[in-house]
Amino acid sequence: MEPIVDFKILPERLRQAAQVVTVAVASPADSHTEEVIERSIAEQFARFILVANAAKADIARRLAADYPDKVTLIVAEDDDDAARHAVKEVREGRADVLMKGSLNTDNLLRAVLNKEEGILIKGSVLTHIAVADVPSLNHLLFFTDAAVIPYPTTEQFDALARYITATYRSITGGDRPRVALIHCTEKVSEKFPLTLSYEELKANAANGAYGEVEIGGPMDVKTACDAESGAIKGIASPVVGNAFPDIEAGNTFYKTLTLFGGATVAGMLVGTSAPVVVTSRADTADSKFYSLATACLKAINK
């Protein structure tokens, strides 16, 4: 089967998997979430457990009535209660993916990270992986971390490398990801401590820590993604995945891709027992739909 190179292929690939993914949605009370749910049902790859805040349950009630075979409704007291119940559905094995609705991200993360009742895997690092469908590229672009870890340690970078290579394989079907370690400089120097962490990642990769993988860096984004720029500098490493030095660089790249690059960007949290879809309120319905689709594919191809 050919690797997935753009988002349009995702729904068909999910149908081919012949496995309907169950998604627990915390507080589905906005029009974008409503659209994503109906579109996913129409594409025949997901069913839903909607955990609605009693004060704003109209959309959830309507969806449960319209799709009785695809939607289960649970009514919670408030957003915090909705988050706890949605996480419980995942923790107890009734749902494969967790999705944020119209509640604040903090409400959901409190439930996800709860030491007794959450779904963060013990000893794991919670991080965000984004996947971009960029018109100028002939493959999907994966990058991390744009949302969770402000300044990753060497140990956290190691976790990010493991997560992003595994996520690339589970979503695209490709077997040899190419990873660029992004920085403003292309030289390893004590003046830039992060470049020293990158050297450790490359050593880990050489020892097989991330499976079959090509890894290079430090390098800037243009060198990483544009073969001509790399050739001019004598660096042959255009890639499908990027690891950013900190959250500021990753988040800026995320927003720039959508605003100026015409990209559609999907994203999920990993390090948990199931993928967690946490999109921004400003994200488009397309972005939210493909975030769910990529999370569902990751859940199937664990």
Regions found by a protein language model. Give the residues of each.
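Anion-binding alpha/beta catalytic cores of soluble intermediary-metabolism enzymes, centered on
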Residues: 1-302
